Amino acid sequence: LQISLENTPFLENTDIENAHKMAELYLIIFCFENSARHFILKIFSSNFGEDWWNIIKNTDFKKKVEERMSREQKLKWICQRGTSPLFYLDWSDLLKIIRKYENLFTPFIADLKFIELRFEELERVRNIIAHNGIIPDKNDINRLILYFQDWCKQLKELSI
């Protein structure tokens, strides 16, 4: 994508520099979050088959997914966020699902605290990135990188 950002009204050069830094972090959180969603989807598909959503959904999840899908149906000029209901749930909802079905996930991640710690700590950072904020704290940046690397190492060679 080639576009000149230097002439963006009301933004200083430091704002543009921050945007470039945040774009790099977005790549990491995008890969982390989508990897997590696909991992959960694989676990449920392999254990419950095609009907997995009807088995795992609760009233809150069902309502949230239906509202978000309905909104997308009305705004046809905007693409869908995903083909699976998991892509319509919040980051924190993913952790709730994993906790509820812990027995399905522990064969792949021996200690659920591995996921809990990373998901809980990264939720704030993820929200800043997702809402076009700036993360100036190098520790938060390093934590995101480290947690993503941990996630990849833990799940890299799994076959589900």
Question: Where in this protein do the model-derived segments appear?
Answer:
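Amphipathic alpha-helical interface elements
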Residues: L1-I160
